[in-house]
A protein has these predicted regions:
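Structural signal for membrane-spanning alpha-helices in multi-pass inner-membrane proteins
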Residues: 23, 65-72, 96, 142-149
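Interfacial segments of alpha-helical transmembrane regions
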Residues: 2-17, 67-92
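Histidine-centered, metal-coordinating catalytic motifs and their short helical/loop contexts
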Residues: 124-133
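Membrane-interfacial segments
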Residues: 38, 76, 111, 153-154
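Core segments of transmembrane alpha-helices
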Residues: 57-68, 135-142
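Short, charged juxtamembrane terminal tails flanking transmembrane helices
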Residues: 2-3, 150-154
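Hydrophobic alpha-helical transmembrane segments of integral membrane proteins
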Residues: 87-108
Length: 154
């Protein structure tokens, strides 16, 4: 059982690290030029299909975290750390569904709106700043997983 616990936690850490890599890449390479020139740059959204990455990474993260939680449930120290990560992740997913994704959809459709480029710029910059905050929370949520790895289970 110890091996399964450790392997599941290692898998969750790898998946989480992959998500963090996607966050950094998106925020350093993709979003700055895309959000700086809306609505003119809205056509860039058709050139990148990052949804396949995110629609794979997030279910893998959810499954790996739940499996890790189940396998480590009897180990209180690990369980609590894994639950911290899950709680932060749940808040991030909810805010993503309620704010970030709808705004991205609005950005994609910005060429057909009556909103001025100046207003799109402000919305894009606000979105990006808030998304950096969301990303920081995702990094913070990684720390408990790493600490759980360090917990003695033998």
């Amino acid at each position: 059982m110890t091996r399964a616990r450790d392997l599941s936690l290692a898998a969750a850490i790898v998946v989480w690290a992959t998500i963090l890599g996607g966050i950094v890449y998106s925020h350093m390479v993709w979003f700055p030029p895309y959000l700086a020139g809306l609505p003119k740059t809205a056509t860039l959204a058709a050139t990148i299909h990052d949804e396949s990455f995110w629609l794979t990474a997030h279910p893998l993260a959810i499954l790996s975290l739940l499996l890790t939680l189940a396998l480590n449930w009897k180990l209180r120290a690990r369980r609590n750390l894994i639950l911290i990560t899950i709680a932060i992740y749940a808040v991030a997913i909810i805010t993503t569904a309620l704010y970030f994704v709808p705004e991205l959809q609005a950005f994609r459709a910005s060429q057909s709106s009556n909103v001025s480029p100046a207003e799109w710029y402000v919305r894009g910059q606000n979105w990006q700043h808030l998304s950096w905050v969301r990303g920081a929370f995702m990094y913070i949520a990684f720390i408990p997983l790493l600490l759980a790895w360090r917990r003695e289970v033998h």
